[in-house]
């Protein structure tokens, strides 16, 4: 049996520590939360990716009554980026979320297992 480790690195920074591009990505991810369709969880998530060619793509979570067949913001964003820019790998990803009160979360939002797998396969 062959054994190997799969790791994911997540950087958590304060807003005043972000680079100019990271600030742009955060803004795009926050904007994307307003395009979320989340009537069941009322947890609006947006994601934005910067591609190697400098393009930025954003996406939001999309729910439906046939749970769990909705899509997370990360996969919506990554799948669109891959179909639109197939030759430009993802450089970095930013995630933003608003809670049921409509306020942005103060704690980081980590990708779910399905999104982590999609990220792993996108590398």
Mark where each language-model region is.
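Short beta-strand scaffold segments in enzyme catalytic cores
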Residues: 42-51
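Short, compositionally biased leader-like segments
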Residues: 1-27
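Short glycine/proline-enriched turns and hinge-like loops at secondary-structure junctions
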Residues: 41-42, 71
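Short Pro/Gly-enriched beta-strand edge/turn motifs at strand-loop
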Residues: 27-34
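Extended beta-strand/beta-hairpin segments
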Residues: 35-41
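Zn2+-dependent cytidine deaminase-like catalytic core
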Residues: 58-123
């Amino acid at each position: 049996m062959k054994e190997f480790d799969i790791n994911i690195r997540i950087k958590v920074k304060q807003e005043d520590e972000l680079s100019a591009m990271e600030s742009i990505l955060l803004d795009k991810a926050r904007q994307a939360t307003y395009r979320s369709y989340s009537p069941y969880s009322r947890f609006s998530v947006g994601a934005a990716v910067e591609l190697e060619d400098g393009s930025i793509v954003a996406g939001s979570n999309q729910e439906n009554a046939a749970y769990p067949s909705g899509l997370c913001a990360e996969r919506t964003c990554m799948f669109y980026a891959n179909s639109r820019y197939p030759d430009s790998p993802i450089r970095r990803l930013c995630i933003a979320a608003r809670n049921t009160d409509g306020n942005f979360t103060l704690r980081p939002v980590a990708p779910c297992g399905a999104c982590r797998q999609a990220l792993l396969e996108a590398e």
